[in-house]
Structures are given as C-alpha cells and as structure tokens.
C-alpha cells in the first residue's frame, strides 16, 4: 500500500480533499434546483462514490511494497475492525442523505455551516483522544470553539434568509407542485427574473424538485442537525464506502416508490430513463469519493483530528458557488463573512 510520509504529500492530499469535498454539495444542489428528483441524483452519486473507493483501493492500496496490501487484508480475520469501518459508512450515508433534503429547506450555505461545524466539533474532539493526542490541544481546541460560534452565526443567517423571503413573497399564493418531468418541458426561461427578487424565488420553486414553499423551515434545520457524521487506510475506506453505498441504495430505492416531503412518486425504470443531470450526479459522487479517500490518507499522516478540519471548505464553496441569496442584504453578508473568518 502507498503510505504518505512527507509533509508536502500530506498538504497536497488535504488541499485536494478541500477542493473535492467543497465542490460536490454545490453540484448536488444544482441538479435539484433544475428539477431532478433527489432519489435519482443520490442513486447516481452513490454508484460513482463507491467506484472511486474501489479505484483507490486497487491502485494506491496495491502499488507499494509496504504491507499489508489491500487484497491481502480482504482475506484476513479482521471483522471487528471491518464492523467499525462499516458503521462509519452507515452514519455517513444517513448524514449525506439528510443534508440533501436540508439543502432545499435551509439553503446550501447555512446547511454546510451548521453540519460541517458540528461534524468538526464532535469529530475533532473524538479523534484527538483516539489519535493518542498527537495534535497540540492549545491549537486544536480554540479552533473547535470557533466552530461552535459558527453554528450560532449559521442560525442567524438562516433567520435572516427566512425573514427576507417571507417579506418578498407576501401577497403571492402557494405554488402548485410539479414533477421533475413537467419541469423539463416547462416554458420558464432562465435568467428572466432578477436574482433575489420574489419572481426569482418563484421561478426557482417551480423548477426545483423539492417544493419548500408553505413548509416550515424548522424541518430543514432538524434534518441539518441530524446530519452530523486494525485495518490499513485503504481497506478501512473500502469497507466504509461499501456500507455507505448499501444504505444509500436501499433507502433511495424505497424513496422512489414511497417518497417523503411531498415529492412525486417515481420508479426504478423512470430512474434509469432519467438522464437529465446524470453527468453532474456522477461527477458529485466521484468528487465526494476521492475527497473522502484523500482525507483518509491525509489523516493517516497528519492525524485524523487535523484532517477533520477539511469540512470548512464546504462553507466557502456553498456560499460563493451557489450564491443563493446571501448577497441580497448587508446583514446576511456580514453574517456569512463572519462564519468564513471564524472557520478559516
């Protein structure tokens, strides 16, 4: 297996993980806002996410003479460690599935601020002790405190967004829900309404797959808080991804026939025939898979408490790639910039 031993290699892994893990949520949100059912998107995502883990395991896990290699460990009696790795994958899959719906209700930037901050607070604290305290506590834990403050700022941004949208939409009646297929044939023209106006919000609502008007945003915040997630690194990541794939596959096939949150019913045949946004969904899965793999590798070299901090990039990408409505009001701009400053 390939083992990273240099500081430069560790930094490279961290930077690539930052880029990949910060990009895929924006891509997933893009497909939902274009009307693709989240069940279809997640099924595509989970396939390429697993494929990325397989590629990493059979390449980086085999190319070096260092032992034990990936294939060697597949036949070893290490089931206690395997079960721990698979448990982590299950929690990751449930968390990712929850955040996919939270993005629609709360917004990408707010969701990522809260989920990533909670994940870093819990994960970094646990990993510090599990790593035999190899990281400096006087540096690590002040950063953890900043993430706790970021949760408060994220809630403030959410409150500002909700009040702003409510004032803009006064006088408009509730919108009728439409299916993903209907949105593909809709006559709505992109860019017709000015970003941030009531007309723009209505256009987005008509086109998106998850309808949020008339529903309490407390649902989204509740989903957001729920979302918080002796083998070699490649074998552990492989089993981690296998369990994540299994849970995501089973739950989303169930959601095809028994959808939640008022989504239209679909079928496995409809999923196979739905090529609208499939390429983006595949790309999101690859980015997340390789990002997680690089985070595992960087964590092996620098300590998993330090590697857990790569979650902060999700905030920057969530706010600036998706734009959402944070630029509409100076108050929201100040809140968001404060969050980014605290978490950098």
From Swiss-Prot:
It is found in: Membrane. Disulfide bonds: none annotated. Residues 1-10, 64-78, 123-136, 230-235, 300-344 are extracellular. The chain crosses the membrane at residues 11-31, 43-63, 79-99, 102-122, 137-157, 209-229, 236-256, 279-299. Residues 32-42, 100-101, 158-208, 257-278 are cytoplasmic. InterPro entries: UPS_plant (IPR030189), Ureide_permease (IPR009834). One of its GO terms (molecular function) is ATP binding. Its main location: membrane. Keywords: ATP-binding, Membrane, Nucleotide-binding, Transmembrane, Transmembrane helix, Transport. ATP binds at residues 209-216. GO terms for cellular component: membrane. This is Ureide permease 3. It is a multi-pass membrane protein. Belongs to the plant ureide permease (TC 2.A.7.19) family. Proton-coupled transporter that transports a wide spectrum of oxo derivatives of heterocyclic nitrogen compounds. It comes from the Eukaryota.
